[in-house]
Regions:
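Conserved acidic donor-binding segment of nucleotide-sugar-dependent glycosyltransferases
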Residues: 328-330, 334-341, 349-356
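Nucleotide-sugar donor phosphate/pyrophosphate-binding loop at the beta->alpha transition
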Residues: 121-123, 130-153, 199
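Aromatic "clamp/platform" in nucleotide-sugar-dependent glycosyltransferases that forms part
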Residues: 296
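A conserved mid-protein helix/loop that constitutes part of the nucleotide-sugar donor-binding site
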Residues: 16, 214-237, 253-259, 342
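Nucleotide-activated donor-binding/catalytic signature segment of Leloir-type glycosyltransferases, i.e.
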Residues: 256-276
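Carbohydrate-associated surface elements
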Residues: 163, 184
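Short hydrophobic beta-strand element within catalytic cores of glycosyltransferases
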Residues: 313-317
Length: 393
């Protein structure tokens, strides 16, 4: 089977999947990218700095960059583009199927309509959930009708997790067309071999947390929708009960304000580590006792995968999509109500109580996330391709 994949730009999370797919027997894969320089020294507004990923994103699979053209009524909207060159490449490529992850961009719709018009099987893998969204009225009715139509045209729905599958089925999707292809990271990258408590204590000392009873970790952009200031509100309620250390890995426009806010609390230890590449993250995860993900909007949240691959529990808001797949109370972490600092404080305190008692099982946490792997995603793609091939034969 010849499979075309359309993506906006290379990323450290998707390139490993494409490399793995390129090794599948009987599959000829080609990835089309619209933008070349993102993640290669270009300014990222979310991190508020220039970002260069330190992993090779373009080896191990066939790819080609195509040139998008701005829409005349949105000349400065980078991702709102049309791309006649891409459509020509899809026409001449003689592809058996096309993978277009979502449906939110103009370019997505050019690809979707091209596939439908030419009777080419269409695969999709959207971040489909309604967390934190109240849908009602005519717009919701139109959205429902639209998704009913769209999913009826999709040949294979690759779901990243439970919420995406439930959303697909609620919109009239067929069970037989749904295949599990989870969002995943390279779990092995975060699993330190021969890990011991002595190693953890050594890492804590390295970052200055040796006097802390509980070390919290946040990893990600410092922007409003991530809700990082909620951690400040929560730990203020706990600082007289627990000697808390906080490690923040990431950057963004809110960094200066957050530094001032956390400094005023008087934590046992506070470290802003700035942006770190994925290859450097393992030590930060292993130095921490728990990852906190307080987002107001988070369709999945791959930092949850990274933390659990490292063997540490996660406290995540109920707006984090991966929480509904990966978090088991008292086993892999806790879920709290988004925006509620009292709820977050309670869950952090429960983590501390668990740590004082039997603690969380590192091996259980790692086993839980082991099914959310690149290999499992490849199996999902392979099953979808087998299904589509059998349907068309």
């Amino acid at each position: 089977m010849r499979l075309a994949i359309v993506r906006t730009h290379p990323t450290q999370y998707f390139s490993p999947l494409f490399k793995a797919l390129a090794n599948v027997s009987g599959l000829e894969l080609k990835v089309f990218y619209l933008f070349e320089n993102r993640g290669r020294g270009e300014f990222d507004p979310g991190f508020n700095r220039n970002i260069s990923w330190d992993t090779e994103l373009l080896t191990g699979y066939e790819y080609e960059f195509v040139t998008p053209r701005p829409l005349p009524f949105k000349p400065k909207a980078v991702f709102e583009s049309r791309c006649p060159e891409l459509i020509e490449k899809l026409k001449s490529g003689n592809f058996d199927a096309i993978f277009c992850a979502g449906y939110g961009l103009w370019i997505d719709w050019q690809v979707i309509f091209f596939a439908i018009r030419n009777n080419i099987p269409l695969f999709c893998r959207p971040e489909l959930n309604d967390l934190g969204v109240v849908r009602r009225g005519p717009r919701n009715w139109l959205r429902t009708r639209f998704l009913n139509w769209y999913f009826s045209k999709v040949s294979a729905f690759l779901f990243i997790g439970k919420l995406a599958r439930d959303g697909y089925l609620s919109m009239g999707g067929e069970v037989s067309k749904a295949f599990f292809a989870p969002y995943a990271v390279n779990n092995e990258l975060f699993q330190l071999s021969n890990f011991t408590e002595e190693k953890k204590n050594s890492l804590k000392e390295r970052f200055g947390f040796e006097k802390c009873e509980l070390v919290l970790l946040y990893v990600g952009r410092l922007v409003p929708r991530k809700g990082v200031d909620l951690i400040a509100q929560a730990v203020t309620k706990l600082r007289h009960k627990i000697k808390i250390g906080l490690l923040i890995v990431g950057d963004g426009p809110e960094r200066s304000a957050l530094e001032s806010e956390f400094d005023a609390i008087g934590l046992e230890k506070l470290v802003f580590a700035g942006f770190q590449n994925q290859s450097k993250l393992s030590d930060y995860y292993h130095a921490a006792d728990v990852l906190v993900v307080p987002s107001f909007v988070e369709p999945w949240g791959l930092v949850v995968n990274e933390a659990m691959a490292s063997g540490i529990p996660v406290v995540a808001s109920d707006r984090v999509g991966s929480a509904y797949d990966l978090i088991e109370p008292e086993k892999t972490g806790y879920i709290f109500k988004a925006g509620d600092s009292f709820s977050l404080a309670k869950k952090i305190e429960q983590v501390f109580e668990m740590k004082q008692g039997l603690g969380f099982s590192r091996s259980y946490i790692q086993r839980k996330v082991s099914n959310y792997s690149i290999q499992e995603a490849v199996r999902g793609f392979s099953a979808a391709m087998k299904y589509v091939s059998s349907e068309s034969s």
